[in-house]
Swiss-Prot record:
SUPFAM superfamilies: Radical SAM enzymes (SSF102114). Keywords: 4Fe-4S, Cytoplasm, Iron, Iron-sulfur, Metal-binding, S-adenosyl-L-methionine, Transferase. The lineage of its organism: Bacteria, Pseudomonadati, Pseudomonadota, Gammaproteobacteria, Candidatus Pseudothioglobaceae. This is Lipoyl synthase. Belongs to the radical SAM superfamily. Lipoyl synthase family. It comes from Vesicomyosocius okutanii subsp. Calyptogena okutanii (strain HA). It is found in: Cytoplasm. [4Fe-4S] cluster 1 binds at residues 62, 67, 73, 302. Pathway: Protein modification; protein lipoylation via endogenous pathway; protein N(6)-(lipoyl)lysine from octanoyl-[acyl-carrier-protein]: step 2/2.
Length: 315
């Protein structure tokens, strides 16, 4: 039996306590504009989905990261499954996932995941994970087991994976994915390179680009995807340069959304980007050659991912 862990105690203040660049908790919070729409968590479908997930000991990044679209997605019966536990080995200040020493991997999770997907009759699933720097392979073998179990149980389901950077283990990870490529390979850059020390401590911009490029080189027919969150201090020129970098590294799909601060202990919102600016970035990205672009204040990496892949306008 696992000892119960108070996940809330591993979030917020305790999570960012040892960061070199700490969020300013005394900073005045910027009022959200009218175009930022979030909903309260309620409804029978939401409760039903949560009950199904807990019964199978599964978690969603929607819940763990306090995604503002949780109610909408849950009410449509969709979710982004988060594998390998609720505890991340990184402490990114924009993210509300807990930080600490993760538990041992649950060897039954891949089967539970596949069974749940079959029970929910899903046609498109997104699988992401916490960072597992404690594992010798970064968790890539567990990703493979999940993909294999899903394909065995529901072979027609489309699978998108949103991966960590497999820091120091890119070649090992790519070797594993050779035998089980997903339908969409997603790895988010999150922000512009100059803001990495503040926004993504422990990550490396060039390294993330390298992961995306190498995967695409090995799997030219698999769609590659990445995402950015705006409002943390980036300039328009910096954003456009990132879009160009992504295209130079053969990334096909793009998501761009507004960063929202989970609590006062997290990275502060510097500005709320107007919807017109998001539309401008969408048009620029399409001109640069991205085949699919979802750009809008409430867009998240896996928000309506099944519609993104079909080219539907997501804002």
């Amino acid at each position: 039996m696992f000892q119960e862990i108070d996940i809330k105690s591993l979030k917020g203040k305790s999570k960012v306590a040892r960061l070199r660049i700490k969020p300013d908790v005394n900073r005045t919070v910027i009022r959200k504009p009218k175009w930022i729409r979030t909903k309260h968590i309620f409804g029978s479908k939401v409760d039903q989905l949560k009950s199904t997930l807990r019964a199978q000991k599964l978690f969603t990044v929607c819940e763990e990261a306090q995604c503002p679209n949780l109610v909408e997605c849950f009410n449509h019966g969709t979710a982004t499954f988060m594998i390998m536990g609720q505890i991340c080995t990184r402490r990114c200040p924009f993210c509300d996932v807990a930080h600490g020493k993760p538990r041992t991997l649950d060897i039954d999770e891949p089967k539970h995941l596949a069974d749940t997907i079959k029970k929910m009759r899903l046609k498109y699933v997104v699988i992401t994970s916490v960072d597992r720097d404690d594992l010798h392979d970064g968790g890539v073998q567990h990703f493979k087991m999940c993909i294999d179990n899903i394909r065995l149980s529901t072979p027609k389901v489309k699978i998108e994976i949103l991966t960590p950077d497999f820091k120091g283990r890119i070649d090992k990870a790519l070797k594993v994915f050779k035998s089980c490529p997903p339908d969409v390979f997603n790895h988010n850059l999150e922000t512009v390179p100059s803001l990495y020390p503040k926004v993504r401590p422990g990550a490396n911009y060039e390294y993330s680009l390298k992961l995306l490029q190498k995967f695409k080189q090995q799997h030219p027919l698999v769609i590659s995807k990445s995402g950015l969150m705006l409002g943390v201090g980036e300039s328009e020129k910096q954003v456009i340069n990132v879009l160009k970098d992504l295209r130079r590294h053969n990334v096909d799909m793009l998501t761009i959304g507004q960063y929202l601060q989970p609590s006062k202990y997290h990275l502060a919102v510097e500005t709320y980007i107007h919807p017109n600016q998001f539309d401008k970035y969408r048009k620029i990205a399409l001109k640069l050659g991205f085949i699919r672009v979802a750009s809008g204040p409430m867009v998240r990496s896996s928000y309506h991912a099944n519609l993104q892949i079909k080219g539907k306008l997501i804002i």
